[in-house]
């Protein structure tokens, strides 16, 4: 499984670079930094079925850092949600693959994103909704470290501590880079670990190299 994931990730990286180059625009850094995370989720962790993307028991994934859409598109294509050839329509007029994910355009997209800071709140709502509907699913949210400049994220962390959803996982892509500078230059946060733990949330850290050890 590990070897397969590594090969999947390598191909997905190639697809991201190719599609962004073909489009002539796109967020390459934020997309490439998310490859290992997305490959692990879709290739080994999440319960999902490309043949039945609306299955009520499917695990949900929210790309809160919506500018990394090329990474999500490449992963969805790789795992069978739509033909790989469609990747070359990224950002084209009338394409289903726009600059940010659109819920109504493409199978496998759970939430239209792009305006930063909304994904954790939406994921919390989805996770709590499973207790109401009786459906058994997990929710995974991927946000960027620069995205945590948005105050709504911290309100969502506070709400997570109150409601304590057992089926919600928030992943921070801690790449230390934002659109026009480093995260440290733009808005120093100090210890992200200490801040998150201060909300009473369980936290663990991983690096891309861990899956090869």
Residue positions per predicted region:
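N-terminal start-of-chain detector that recognizes signal peptides
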Residues: 10-11, 34, 112-113, 140-143, ...
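Thiamine diphosphate
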Residues: 6, 21, 92-104, 122, ...
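N-terminal hydrophobic or amphipathic helices/low-complexity stretches enriched
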Residues: 1-12, 16
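Cofactor-binding active-site loop characterized by glycine-rich and histidine/acidic residues
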Residues: 16-19, 31-162
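Globin-like tetrapyrrole-binding proteins
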Residues: 27
């Amino acid at each position: 499984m590990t070897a397969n994931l590594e090969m999947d990730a390598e191909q997905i990286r190639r697809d991201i670079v190719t599609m962004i180059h073909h489009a002539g625009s796109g967020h390459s850094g934020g997309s490439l930094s998310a490859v290992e995370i997305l490959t692990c989720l879709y290739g080994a962790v999440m319960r999902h079925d490309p043949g039945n993307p609306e299955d009520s028991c499917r695990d949900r994934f929210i790309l809160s850092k919506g500018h990394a859409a090329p990474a999500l598109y490449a992963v969805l294509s790789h795992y069978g949600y739509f033909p790989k050839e469609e990747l070359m329509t990224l950002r084209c007029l009338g394409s289903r693959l726009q600059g940010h994910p659109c819920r109504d355009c493409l199978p496998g997209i759970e939430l239209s994103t792009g305006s930063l800071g909304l994904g954790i709140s939406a994921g919390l709502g989805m996770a709590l909704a499973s207790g109401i509907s009786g459906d058994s699913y997990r929710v995974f949210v991927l946000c960027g470290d620069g995205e945590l400049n948005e105050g709504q994220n911290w309100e969502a962390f506070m709400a997570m501590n109150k409601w304590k959803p057992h089926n919600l996982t928030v992943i921070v892509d801690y790449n230390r880079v934002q659109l026009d500078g480093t995260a440290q230059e733009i808005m120093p946060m100090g210890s992200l670990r200490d801040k998150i733990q201060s909300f009473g949330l369980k936290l663990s850290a991983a690096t891309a190299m861990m899956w090869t050890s």
